[in-house]
Amino acid sequence: MCHTSHSSGCPMACPGSPCCVPSTCYPPEGYGTSCCCSAPCVALLCRPLCGVSTCCQPACCVPSPCQVACCVPVSCKPVLCVASFCPTSGCCQPFCPTLVYRPVTWSTPTGC
């Protein structure tokens, strides 16, 4: 079930933090759920969602053991790039696979 309430109403909080609000749960019902932040980026809100969500785009790019820092359901930008760009770039977007979980590959969009 997908909840949009506070952490008490979220089935699975992001590691290291309460469930983000506002929130969206990925993947869809039947595949298990997790929380994905749709607000400005918070580094601790992270789960490997790109493999199952419509698309993920981080609001900011931070060094993290997590594959995604913050996700919002926006247009996917499937540009493959060197993963190490993420911690050093001021503006990154992930490639969003649609079928399976896999590490996020980062890109540096024009203008960043």
From Swiss-Prot:
Taxonomy of the source species: Eukaryota, Metazoa, Chordata, Craniata, Vertebrata
Keywords on record: Keratin, Repeat
Cellular compartments per GO CC: cytosol; intermediate filament
Positions of Sequence repeats: 10-14, 20-24, 25-29, 35-39, 41-45, 46-50, 56-60, 61-65, 66-70, 71-75, 76-80, 81-85, 86-90, 91-95, 96-100
Name of the protein in question: Keratin-associated protein 12-4
Gene: KRTAP12-4
Chain residue ranges for the region called 15 X 5 AA approximate repeats: 10-100
Function: In the hair cortex, hair keratin intermediate filaments are embedded in an interfilamentous matrix, consisting of hair keratin-associated proteins (KRTAP), which are essential for the formation of a rigid and resistant hair shaft through their extensive disulfide bond cross-linking with abundant cysteine residues of hair keratins. The matrix proteins include the high-sulfur and high-glycine-tyrosine keratins.
Membership in a protein family: Belongs to the KRTAP type 12 family.
Tissue specificity: Restricted to a narrow region of the hair fiber cuticle, lying approximately 20 cell layers above the apex of the dermal papilla of the hair root; not detected in any other tissues.
Subunit field text: Interacts with hair keratins.
Coiled coil: none
Transmembrane regions: none
